[in-house]
Amino acid sequence: MIKIENISYGYKSNHPIFNDISLEIGNGIYGLLGENGVGKTTLIHLICGLLFPWKGECKIDNCNSVQRSPELLCHYFFLPEEMQMPTESIYQFAAHHSVFYPHFSRKEFEQNLEELHIDGKQKLSTVSYG
């Protein structure tokens, strides 16, 4: 569960984007819709602990996201819309980064690749984001 309590934040001190907002997001799949520039990405960054609210707090499963604790980070991963992808293979990338996720299962990883018809030897930079 994601819980946002009384968050205020803005890029300029005299112009808040969010002013004392609160909401709870339960388990499930959600979409975040809004006009260009209204703060969708900023909200996601606040939830992930990549930005720090002026006031209030964001919690994911009762862990304050700003603290970026290992018990929180080992269960969640934020994949930005645009990012530089490494030129190593999918298998190499998984081998290098799976050590940061104690619950990573090589077996599940292999099953997911198979279900999605993705070749693990393929360079990560060539895989579709879709």
Residue map of PLM features:
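Walker A (P-loop) phosphate-binding loop of ABC-type ATPase nucleotide-binding domains
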Residues: G34-G39
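Conserved structural motif at the start of ABC-family nucleotide-binding domains
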Residues: I2-I4, P16-D20
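Short coil-to-beta microelement around the adenine-binding A-loop and adjacent beta1/P-loop entry
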Residues: N14-P16, P70
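Conserved A-loop
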Residues: S8-S13, I25, I60, Y101
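Short beta-strand immediately N-terminal to the Walker A/P-loop
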Residues: Y30-L32
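Conserved ABC transporter NBD signature motif
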Residues: G56-Q67, E71-L72
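Helix-to-loop junction immediately C-terminal to a conserved catalytic motif
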Residues: C48
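ABC-family P-loop ATPase nucleotide-binding domains
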Residues: F78-G130
